UniProtKB/Swiss-Prot annotation:
One of its GO terms (molecular function) is 3-deoxy-8-phosphooctulonate synthase activity. Its main location: cytoplasm. GO terms for biological process: keto-3-deoxy-D-manno-octulosonic acid biosynthetic process. This is 2-dehydro-3-deoxyphosphooctonate aldolase. It is an enzyme of class 2 (transferase). HAMAP family: KDO8P_synth. It is found in: Cytoplasm. It catalyses: D-arabinose 5-phosphate + phosphoenolpyruvate + H2O = 3-deoxy-alpha-D-manno-2-octulosonate-8-phosphate + phosphate. SUPFAM superfamilies: Aldolase. Pfam families: DAHP_synth_1. NCBIfam families: KDO8P_synth, PRK05198.1.
């Protein structure tokens, strides 16, 4: 599949979607995007910058949600033009899709909205590539009808993203079989290595996370075989305004990505034949 200006798929090298969870300031986004561009350029990795203008599903009603649509799009546009990288952001049911699509290169649907038929169709009808996150409550094989809805709009540039499955209260687990199952949708599969270690609502008024397991799950997913990796990152996760406990430190991204690219090359060298 053609994504932005590069090809993605199991016959192509791993690509990266990364950035801070939420837009905190113009300077932070430019700094992070610039550093990620340096890292990915050095390693030869195709890169899409990600950040959100509105986090609509925060645990607490008083938590920081972002700068909002107008200011958020200004920041994303600046990243795109000044840093020279494609940008992705997530949208919601109330989002003016065409307005966002005029700025960003890739749209993303939140996991909690994966079953909202009209929403999925509206996003995909905007004509941009779409990364559809699998709900924490959804079986991987149930992504096939979601993809069918998406492609009914005529948009063939659809990706599916695994971000963990609910496992009791305040916990997620990553079933690596889902990565293989979701290939049957015919779409590139992306693994979200940072939200997969989230502990939803685990700190009472906010979500916790176990960032030490980000490289563990990322390595496992790459070994199974994925098209892309999604990872939220921050220069100082302890001070991040959203999802800090599961964000990967920016100063450790190069080391992690270097390892993952080596694993990706070995995995894809041997193919993905099904064994009965």
């Amino acid at each position: 599949m053609k994504l932005c200006d590069f090809e993605v798929g199991l016959d192509q090298p791993l690509f990266l979607i990364a950035g801070p969870c939420v837009i905190e300031s113009m300077q932070l986004q430019l700094d992070v995007a610039g550093r990620l561009k340096e890292i990915t350029g050095k390693l030869g990795v195709n890169f899409i910058f990600k950040s959100s203008f509105d986090k609509a599903n925060r645990t607490s009603g008083t938590s920081f949600r972002g700068p909002g649509l107008e200011e958020g799009l200004k920041v994303l546009d600046a990243v795109k033009k000044q840093i020279g990288v494609p940008v992705l952001t997530d949208v919601h049911e109330y989002t003016p899709m065409n307005e966002v699509a005029a700025v960003v290169d890739v749209l993303q649907t939140p996991a909690f909205l994966v079953r909202q038929t009209d929403f999925i169709k509206n996003v995909c009808a905007a004509g941009k590539p779409v990364n559809i996150k699998k709900g924490q409550f959804l079986a991987p094989w149930d992504m096939k009808p979601v993809v069918d809805k998406a492609k009914s709009t005529g948009n063939e540039q659809i990706m599916v993203c695994e971000r963990g499955a609910s496992f009791g209260y305040n916990n997620l687990v990553s079933d690596m079989r889902s990565l293989s199952v979701m290939r049957d949708t015919g779409c590139p599969v992306v693994f979200d290595a940072t939200h997969s270690v989230q502990l939803p609502g685990g700190q009472g008024s906010s979500s916790g996370g176990q960032r030490e397991f980000v490289p563990v799950l990322a390595r496992a997913a790459v070994a199974v075989g994925i098209s892309g990796l999604f990872a939220e990152t921050h220069p100082d996760p302890s001070k991040a305004l959203s999802d800090g406990p599961n964000a990967w430190p920016l100063d450790r991204m190069e080391e992690l990505l270097e390892t993952l690219m080596e694993l990706d090359a070995v995995t894809k060298k041997h193919g993905f034949a099904r064994f009965a």
